[in-house]
């Protein structure tokens, strides 16, 4: 049996193209495993967290918000970017409270998600929240959204049939279904 090839690409040069509040775009020249050179366009984005929050009736808190990039309203789990140095659990709890007003008694990890590892450097941390107590939303000034409650089985169906195409939502719902036998 042949030894597996070392698949590592080595960065040779980096050119910074854009630096914004939440992302930086680079163009990197790399050395490929075969010794040739190639160019990689890279978007470094701050990490984020998303929460699959279930109420006492096993309904999912779904955030409906307009996504400018796609020009439409999407159904998603409560989520957001982590503050610099912020622990993923702390950030996820903060986002859940800000967007829905919910605070959970039980909070479990559902793993991580790499949304587009070919060019996009972001890790999303996924969590499950149960035993919810509700207070007021604490939305950011530029945040406009509606919160709906959708039965968990309906969310599974909507994720599987493609009605919901947000990666973090699909991943968290299906992981919860399989891992926790919900």
Task: Give a label for each model feature.
Residues 1-19:
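Extreme N-terminal tail/first-helix region
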Residues 14-50, 56-57:
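Acidic, metal-coordinating catalytic segment for phosphate/diphosphate chemistry
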Residues 25-27, 39, 63, 77, ...:
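Hydrophobic residues on conserved beta-strands that form the core of alpha/beta folds
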Residues 38, 47-50, 55, 81-167:
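Unchanged
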Residues 48-72, 76:
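A glycine-rich, hydrophobic loop/mini-helix early in the fold
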Residues 59-60, 133-135, 181:
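Short helix-loop capping/hinge motifs at secondary-structure junctions, enriched
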Residues 162, 178-180:
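Short glycine-centered helix-capping/turn motifs at secondary-structure transition points
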């Amino acid at each position: 049996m042949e030894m597996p090839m070392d698949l590592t690409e080595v960065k040779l040069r980096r050119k910074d193209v854009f630096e914004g509040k939440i992302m930086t775009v680079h163009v990197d020249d790399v050395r490929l495993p075969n010794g040739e050179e190639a160019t990689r366009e890279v978007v470094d984005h701050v990490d984020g967290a998303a929460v699959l929050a279930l109420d006492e009736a096993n309904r999912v808190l779904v955030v409906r918000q307009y996504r400018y990039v796609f020009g439409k309203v999407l159904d998603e789990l409560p989520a957001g970017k982590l503050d610099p140095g912020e622990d993923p659990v702390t950030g996820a709890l903060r986002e859940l409270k800000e967007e829905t007003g919910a605070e959970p008694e039980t909070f479990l990890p559902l793993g991580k998600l790499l949304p587009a590892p070919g060019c996009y450097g972001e890790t999303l941390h996924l969590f499950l929240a149960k035993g919810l107590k509700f207070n007021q939303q604490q939305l950011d000034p530029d945040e406009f959204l509606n919160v709906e409650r959708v039965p968990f089985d309906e969310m599974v169906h909507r994720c599987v049939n493609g009605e919901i195409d947000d990666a973090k939502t699909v991943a968290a719902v299906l992981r919860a279904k399989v891992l926790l036998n919900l």
